[in-house]
Amino acid sequence: MLKRDMNIADYDAELWHAMEQEVVRQEEHIELIASENYTSPRVMQAQGSQLTNKYAEGYPGKRYYGGCEYVDVVEQLAIDRAKALFGADYANVQPHSGSQANFAVYTTLLQPGDTVLGMNLAHGGHLTHGSPVNFSGKLYNIVPYGIDESGHIDYDQLAELAKTHQPKMIIGGFSAYSGVVDWARMRQIADSIGAYLFVDMAHVAGLIAAGVYPNPVPHAHVVTTTTHKTLAGPRGGLILAKGGSEELYKKLNSAVFPGAQGGPLMHVIAAKAVALKEAMEPAFKTYQQQVAKNAKAMVEVFLSRGFNVVSGATDNHLFLLDLVDKNLTGKEADAALGRANITVNKNSVPNDPKSPFVTSGMRIGTPAVTRRGFTEADVRDLAGWMCDVLENIHDDAVIERTKNKVLDICDRHPVYA
């Protein structure tokens, strides 16, 4: 017999201890990994609900199992909210992750061996945009495009590559690019050769929902996103489209189920519905505006302290530090800041001489710290502390002083008050 007062702490102390330590880590560390964020308690409530018990293969009104009348309501709410939030006329909320959403798009629009233009991973792209270690690089003929000397997407190069290689699909989107993408220009290039434009907006979906960053949905044939990152929802994926045919939408649905997945995670879909509603609130727009302001404020400090910021600016929630001229590796920077309770991730930079396991750069993002209530003044202080550590990575006293400052500001800005 199952009882509602069953809990992990009384049953599995070893596991519970690790979970509790993670709670402490999140509260006592400053999170600057650009792809991470904090979900609301409402989102977590949905993920811990009894919806996890329900199998619901298929789509609302067309299930392979009985007893789906209420999960149909849940999924339809998520679909309708996704369409309304991003101005789409099609949404699939079932992908378990952004990568699986991307896989569904590839299998819908392409055949193995087709040519695809994707952003070079070292220039800011993503594994699923053509990395040789990923399915995208293994199954398709990938032609990478990149950024120019100023750190911005080279649209002339992209147009020339498209003309030369005649890809069937061009991918827009990124995991480490701090500029604004000209979606209309990308669509123009795609149309000039009869290619599909597929946009992966995972990193900027929250900014787009709030009107802080341009929306690719009116320009792309298909758009995907994660529902975490800047959108601040549960970990999962989403597929969107506007102005496409019913045939395309049916193919996309079939590519998700039964093509790549079985039963959807209904508790996660409920959490997506909650997060999408939260993203429609005025407070969410204010939050996203502050995310962008905080990123700009941090860039100003790093530049003033003599650090090289790729492109010299940011127009979204993230930026890259190029540490080559500081004689530092990304791995060293990551470790030193980690000792001061500041969490970042090492990241390759354009023309990086180091391996992806070492790198010469560091990616910094502001969604999580802004979620805690950090202001521009707070992140300017934070950026200054980071510079102190990066300039003295072997000085334990500097790192300890910085850690104490971090603990103090974390105490003043709890993740969950």
From Swiss-Prot:
Gene3D superfamilies: Aspartate Aminotransferase, domain 1, Type I PLP-dependent aspartate aminotransferase-like (Major domain)
GO CC list: cytosol
InterPro entries referenced in this protein's UniProt entry, alphabetically: PyrdxlP-dep_Trfase, PyrdxlP-dep_Trfase_major, PyrdxlP-dep_Trfase_small, Ser_HO-MeTrfase, Ser_HO-MeTrfase-like, Ser_HO-MeTrfase_PLP_BS, SHMT-like_dom
Keyword Lipoprotein attributed: no
E.C. no: 2.1.2.1
Known cofactor(s): pyridoxal 5'-phosphate
GO biological process: glycine biosynthetic process from serine; tetrahydrofolate interconversion
Subcellular localization(s) per the UniProt record: Cytoplasm
Pathway field: One-carbon metabolism; tetrahydrofolate interconversion; Amino-acid biosynthesis; glycine biosynthesis; glycine from L-serine: step 1/1
CDD domains: SHMT (cd00378)
Molecular function terms from GO: glycine hydroxymethyltransferase activity; pyridoxal phosphate binding
Highest taxon in the source lineage: Bacteria
Record site: Plays an important role in substrate specificity: 228
Keywords, in A-Z order: Amino-acid biosynthesis, Cytoplasm, One-carbon metabolism, Pyridoxal phosphate, Transferase
Catalytic activity of the protein: (6R)-5,10-methylene-5,6,7,8-tetrahydrofolate + glycine + H2O = (6S)-5,6,7,8-tetrahydrofolate + L-serine
Residue numbers binding (6S)-5,6,7,8-tetrahydrofolate: 121, 125-127, 355-357
Keyword Transferase appears in the UniProt entry: yes
Modification type N6-(pyridoxal phosphate)lysine: residues: 229
Similarity comment text for this entry: Belongs to the SHMT family.
NCBIfam families for this protein: PRK00011.1 (NF000586)
Function per UniProt: Catalyzes the reversible interconversion of serine and glycine with tetrahydrofolate (THF) serving as the one-carbon carrier. This reaction serves as the major source of one-carbon groups required for the biosynthesis of purines, thymidylate, methionine, and other important biomolecules. Also exhibits THF-independent aldolase activity toward beta-hydroxyamino acids, producing glycine and aldehydes, via a retro-aldol mechanism.
Assembly mode: Homodimer.
Protein's recorded name: Serine hydroxymethyltransferase
